[in-house]
Structures are given as C-alpha cells and as structure tokens.
Amino acid sequence: MTIKVNCIGYPRIGPKRELKNALEKYWKSEISEADLLKCASELKKNNWQTQKDNGVDYICSNDFSFYDQVLDTICLVGSIPERYKHKDDKVSFKTYFAMARGSQTKDLDVPALEMTKWFDTNYHYLVPEFSKNQKFKLSSNKPFDEFDEAKKLGFNTKPIILGPLTFLSLGKTTDETFKSIDLLDNLLPVYAEILSVLNKKGAEWIQIDEPILVKNQNADFTKLIKKTLNQLKKFAGSSKIILTTYFEKLDSEIEKEILESDVDGIHLDLIRGKISNINSLRDINKTISIGIIDGRNIWKSDVNKKIEQVLEYSKFIKNLWISSSCPLLH
C-alpha cells in the first residue's frame, strides 16, 4: 500500500494579489504583455516550489489562468464565437481579453461572453457558446507550455485539463434545435491531440476535471461517461489519467461507471460527499485520491482526525492519495 500527497489545483492570484495588480496595469496599458507574462512565470514558479517544499508528490500545472479555466478551455479547443474575429492559429491576448471583458476599439467593438457562477462557489466563469455546426481546433499551447516551463525548473507536474463533458455541459447553444453535449464527437479529436502531446512530453499523470459528474444526470448522459473516459484514456497512451470530481457526492451509478472505466485513478470530494460502497474498492486496481482537507475554507484541519480517516481508507485502498476536497483557489 502506498500513500501520496496530491494537489488538484493551487491558488493563482499570488500571496500579495500580484496577478490582480498586474492585470489591472496591463489593461490600463501601464505594463507590456511581456511584463504580464513575467509576473505569471514568477507566480507559477513560486507555486510549484511551495508545493514541493510542503511534500506534495503530485504537483499540478495548467491550473494557472489569467481569467478562468473555462475561458482557457474555450481557447484551447478553438471555440471562439465569430464576433471576436479570431483568424490566427493560436488565440492572442487581444482575443482572450475581448472575450473576458469585451472590446470597444475601432477594429473590435463587442461585449464580453456571459458570466455565471462556477457551481456553488463565489467564483465565476465565462460561458462557452456553441453553434450547431461548431468546429473545434487546437488553438492554444498553454498546457504544453506550462508543463515544459515546470520541467525546465525541475518540477515534474501533473497537467490539469477541464474535461469535455463538463466543458460542453457548462456552455450554451445558439439555438434550441440541439444540445451542447451533442457536440461531444466533434470535440473529442481535439482532446485526443491534447492528451497525445502531453504524453509525448512525458506527463506521467494527467488530471481530467469533470465536476459536472456530481450533478444529477439523465440516463442518456450517464451512458456517455464510461465511453468518453475510455476514449480519453486511449488518447493518453502510456500517461495515466486521474478523473477528478468535486463539490458534491457522486451518484452511485455514476461512481460505478467511473470505477468500471479504463481511467487509472479517481479523485473524490469526501468533505461534501462519501464513497458509495467502500468495500467495492478492495479489488479495484485504481489510484483513489481522497479529498479530506476542506478546499473551501482557510481553517486548519484536525490532524488527528484526518490521520484516523486515512488509516481507515488505507484498509480498503491499495494506492491512496491524500488531497483537498476541491482545488485550493476556492
């Protein structure tokens, strides 16, 4: 039996709100794009070092964002609405921040994307927009660049990617003749490319975030889960996939679908939820990451109680990771 420490997402604003301050200066044209990128690099470096210094075995990358992780995914898969006039192979800062904040220039006069709450947190995300003939294309190197950036500094990280089921489910359609999840087959080839590149770069583990799975889903959606996860695992090749859920308990049927899939691990929020049938984990050859530290408050945990929890779960789980209930930015 092995026990490891797993970080599923680290705060990005900086201990002195460095990112917020740099962004405000950038938007006022008081600093350059290069200055903003330098600030981001320093924050990421400090975050990785902090995790290493505190004994984290699985340090994460691609959890940093200049705005929010859903907007980053919009850019990653190239689902930029036509009104933003994106024509280049890769999404520029100009287009990125036009979607985030709107643009009132001679060349581009558009409102921002709609914003709504990220599940039941105080954080918000920009809502993806999908048309019936939506095309997807790899349009950002962000996860690859950040993995390489960490590697050059001596950190072997676990890249985090927002999963396709959550990404589509959080979006809205331009008309009512189709559902966003209908675009799954169109989207998956881009995920194949993303996971293949990360595999070639040497990622041992890749974290796929699918928090939408904690929400009540209909039978048609539930049928997609195992099939989709199996495809993602196939795309990743020799890299291992840990499917990460948080904010609530998984429905027992959805939990069963995940455990029967080909992914190598699963993260569960055990602050707001619990494992449906812990005895079922005895013969499961998967890594189980247990979110026993509350990721949604700043208070210290009762260490003795947490040790008791870990010892209890270790009786049933061969490969056990300890983590926070959700990413720490919440």
Where are these regions (language model features)?
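Domain-level signal for soluble alpha/beta catalytic cores
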Residues: M1-H330
